[in-house]
């Protein structure tokens, strides 16, 4: 109960971590069978200090799918449906983390986002 109270408190106080910004970058289009590589640049917070750094995507029609994360300690967790094609890595010196999705098809058509 104390943990939940603390989490609620942290989310309820305006301004906490409000300067954290995540910005995606990468190619706008990738041809079928190629690999998609995206970068997420984080400012205002060190990716090694805490949190899970996620990739999600939104398909046409607005359906969201969580793809996976890399945690502050470098460990990964992936959506089982993507496990054979996805890799999420990081460069702590640049405070960036990366998505690589192999063998893309038209079913991977989506808008890709990074999030914490």
Curated annotation (Swiss-Prot):
It holds the Pfam family V-set. SUPFAM superfamilies: Immunoglobulin (SSF48726). Residues 85-116 are annotated as: Framework-3. Residues 1-18 form the signal peptide. One of its GO terms (biological process) is adaptive immune response. The keyword Disulfide bond applies. InterPro entries: Ig-like_dom (IPR007110), Ig-like_dom_sf (IPR036179), Ig-like_fold (IPR013783), Ig_V-set (IPR013106), IgHV (IPR050199). Residues 68-84 are annotated as: Complementarity-determining-2. Disulfide bonds join 40-114. SMART domains: IGv. Residues 49-53 are annotated as: Complementarity-determining-1. This is Ig heavy chain V region 3-6.
């Amino acid at each position: 109960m104390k943990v939940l109270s603390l989490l609620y408190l942290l989310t309820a106080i305006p301004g906490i971590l409000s300067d954290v910004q995540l910005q995606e970058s990468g190619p706008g289009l990738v041809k079928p069978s190629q690999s998609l590589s995206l970068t997420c640049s984080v400012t205002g917070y060190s990716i090694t200090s805490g949190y899970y750094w996620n990739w999600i995507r939104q398909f046409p029609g607005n359906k969201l799918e969580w793809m996976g994360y890399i945690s502050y300690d470098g460990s990964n967790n992936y959506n089982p449906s993507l496990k054979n094609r996805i890799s999420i890595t990081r460069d702590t010196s640049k405070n960036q983390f990366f998505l690589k999705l192999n063998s893309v098809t038209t079913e991977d058509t989506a808008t890709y986002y990074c999030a914490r």
